[in-house]
Amino acid sequence: MWFASMASNVGTWMHTVAASWLMTTIATSPLPVALVQTATSMPMFLLGLPAGAIADLVDRRRLLIFTQSWMLAAAAVLGVLALAGVIGPWTLLALTFALGLGSGMNGPAWAAAIPELVSREELAAAVALNSVQFNIARAIGPALGGFVMAASSAGIVFLLNAVSFLGVILVLGRWREVRPAGSAERAPLDQSGVHRAMRQGLHYVRSTPAYHAVLIRTGLFSFAGSALWAMLPVVTSATLAGTSTGYGILLGCLGAGAVVGAAILAPLRRRFSEDRIVVAGVMLFAVATLALATVRNFSVVALAMLVGGVAWMTAMSTFSVCAQTAPPLWLRARALAVYLMVFQGALAVGSGIWGEIAGRIGVRVSLLVSAATLVAGLAAGFWLPLSAREEEAPLDLVAQGEGGSDG
């Protein structure tokens, strides 16, 4: 599963490079380029809670097979249209959005499956290991995507991404989900069950102050930090390497930094609190954003992206551990869905806003304001400390859960 997932993520990152770079060649302003990130992230915001409720109610294996098949089909259509030369900005955004829909349904089920495979003591290591494969793919995929696109075309990259989903589908076909001993059976999926499950998830989130801290601080970081991800292809095209290979290398440096961040996260968590790790990560990511705005030397920017990858990984993994540890098992997918909604929604909205600012005032100003916002957002830590321990569900929800209506 780990290797199949990594191969699929390599394909996804290859697609990210190809889609963003293709948009720089067919669009006339920074906004459509930034909207590629919005089209990728917005589906998670729109589908996150229903997807989490469904993931708590149905066989996750079948759900994951469906979502992987959906993404395979969307990537294949995108590849065929690109090879035929009939793809425009809105078609590219629409099919990227379709891929995001599959990812939005896939995310909560995948995240909720991780804690079922390991003990609570091993959860942080498992989250980091899952992030390692994702970020190894992030390090390899962009550079590989840039090279393949330079040697052939975006359409070939999109088709390779479609093929990458096959491995996960084959592995999922052999996987059988194991329910923890003593847990209730899932009820048959129906509209009332999904609505009830969604209401329970929202009730848990509203009633748990410790979860508020995770959501608010994740949203602030994701919103402010989205400028770097959205503007990187624009800056690369206009003032740095000017090639898809160069963009792939810079995006790969972010991924390589994330691998380093995953490797050092466990010792950091033994020595420092969650809040201190997040503060350091946010500050370093602000420095990386500032470097992208002001530095015009490719090697220096590559080093800054490496540091930015370390920063993004340590901060986001810390948020993720807190989000996965807090909810009880029977509510976990729904609570994680809200967390992923906040993360992806802030990323989507932020990308659009930073792209609009870049189009009106300039890319450099957009990045500078983003860096300042990252630093200003650290003030939230004084009022919203993070906690990596389980938070009990309200008694009325516990009674409903013991009734077995939602597994």
Predicted regions mapped to residue ranges:
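Alpha-helical transmembrane-bundle signature of multi-pass membrane transport and export proteins
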Residues: 1-407
